[in-house]
């Protein structure tokens, strides 16, 4: 992909200020865009409004600016883009990809237990497809994507890019078709996930009326013309679902690069939820040097602008960064 076509983004959730871990993703996405002579956008992912803190979006932009990271277009907020998400859901419903679900978490747990499939992944129950054939008189609570709509295999085959494959395989135990997605991550290499087994039909619109992260991200990446996604490795698990949604909506798939995580003293990922300290922007170069070290980039002295310029050059050199050559 040519450098002029490149468009990347940093998409933080305003659940708290940036910390050392989120700066790694911000710096990596900015460097990748600059190394490609492309555009770098910022999107505030505030679709999960109950978790968002007032005033945090502007505070994040101020933190980025203090570190010399300025977007090439005005930032957008997901909370103002509900009409786009509704259009996407309407399309998925019309094409048979989405269906209403009346299940509560208790319903899902009971259905899994009754079938001997008490499956749980990352604290979430793997949906067994209870409402695929209808609500049986119950009111709709949420909307889900049917991940094994295998009659679309020919359409997938026509649309799939190089390094991406979507296969429909028969489960030898159940005889049911399952969907496995394979893609190439620029750092992690070949990745694959059986979405049917590991996730099940996932939520597009929640029971509380809020839009699900997966749908919002896919719609926004396409609407903003994002060609390359550079984000933390904790989000790699979302990629297969997002590729499925892109295919179902007929949208392009960006290239993906998932960066190393910053771990806390307890060995867990540094995050706002486990009390990560807000980024100290009074010493931006020190904060940037810490982030650069995680990315395998050499330390810099002097001012922030010179340091960023040096890291852009180093980013282009495969000996100085952990991922594959620019593509």
Curated annotation (Swiss-Prot):
- One Pfam family per UniProt: tRNA-synt_1c
Annotated residues that bind ATP are located at 272
One GO term of the biological process aspect: glutamyl-tRNA aminoacylation
The cofactor binding remark recorded in the entry reads:
Binds 1 zinc ion per subunit.
Binding positions for Zn(2+) per the UniProt entry: 101, 103, 127, 131
Q: Where is this motif: 'HIGH' region?
A: 12-22
Provenance organism? Polaromonas naphthalenivorans (strain CJ2)
* HAMAP family, sorted: Glu_Q_tRNA_synth
UniProt lists the family membership as follows: Belongs to the class-I aminoacyl-tRNA synthetase family. GluQ subfamily.
Instruction: Tell me which InterPro entries the record gives.
Output: Glu-Q_tRNA(Asp)_Synthase, Glu/Gln-tRNA-synth, Glu/Gln-tRNA-synth_Ib_cat-dom, GluQ/Sye, Rossmann-like_a/b/a_fold
The transmembrane segments are: none
Keyword set includes Signal: no
Question: Could you say which EC number(s) this protein's record lists?
Answer: 6.1.1.-
This protein is called: Glutamyl-Q tRNA(Asp) synthetase
Motif 'KMSKS' region: chain residues? 269-273
Record's keyword terms, sorted: Aminoacyl-tRNA synthetase, ATP-binding, Ligase, Metal-binding, Nucleotide-binding, Zinc
């Amino acid at each position: 992909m040519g450098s002029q076509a490149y468009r990347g983004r940093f998409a933080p959730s305003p659940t708290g200020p940036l910390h050392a871990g989120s700066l790694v993703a911000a710096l990596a996405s900015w460097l990748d865009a600059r190394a490609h002579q492309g555009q770098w956008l910022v999107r505030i992912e505030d679709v999960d409004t109950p978790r968002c803190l007032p005033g945090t979006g502007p505070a994040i932009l101020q933190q980025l600016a203090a570190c010399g990271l300025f977007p090439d277009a005005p930032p957008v907020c997901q909370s103002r883009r509900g009409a786009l998400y509704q259009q996407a859901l309407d399309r998925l419903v019309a094409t048979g990809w989405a269906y209403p679900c009346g299940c509560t978490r208790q319903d899902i747990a009971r259905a899994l237990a009754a079938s001997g499939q008490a499956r749980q992944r990352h604290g979430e129950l793997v949906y067994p497809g209870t409402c695929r054939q209808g609500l049986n008189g119950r009111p709709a609570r949420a909307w889900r994507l049917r991940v094994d709509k295998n009659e679309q295999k020919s359409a997938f085959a026509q649309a799939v890019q190089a390094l991406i494959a979507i296969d429909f395989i028969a489960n030898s135990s159940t005889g049911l078709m399952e969907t496995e997605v394979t893609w190439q991550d620029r750092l992690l290499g070949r990745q694959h996930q059986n979405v049917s087994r590991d996730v099940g039909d996932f939520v597009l619109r929640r029971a509380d009326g809020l839009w699900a992260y997966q749908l919002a991200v896919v719609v926004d990446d396409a609407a903003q013309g994002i060609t390359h996604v550079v984000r933390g490795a904790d989000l790699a698990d979302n990629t297969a679902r997002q590729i499925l949604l892109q295919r179902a909506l007929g949208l392009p798939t960006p290239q993906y690069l998932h960066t190393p995580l910053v771990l806390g003293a307890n060995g867990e990922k540094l995050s706002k939820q486990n009390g990560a300290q807000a980024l100290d922007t009074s010493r931006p170069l020190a904060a940037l040097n810490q982030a650069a070290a995680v990315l395998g980039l050499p330390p810099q002295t002097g001012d922030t602008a010179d340091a960023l310029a040096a890291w852009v050059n180093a980013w282009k050199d495969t000996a100085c960064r952990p991922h594959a050559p620019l593509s």
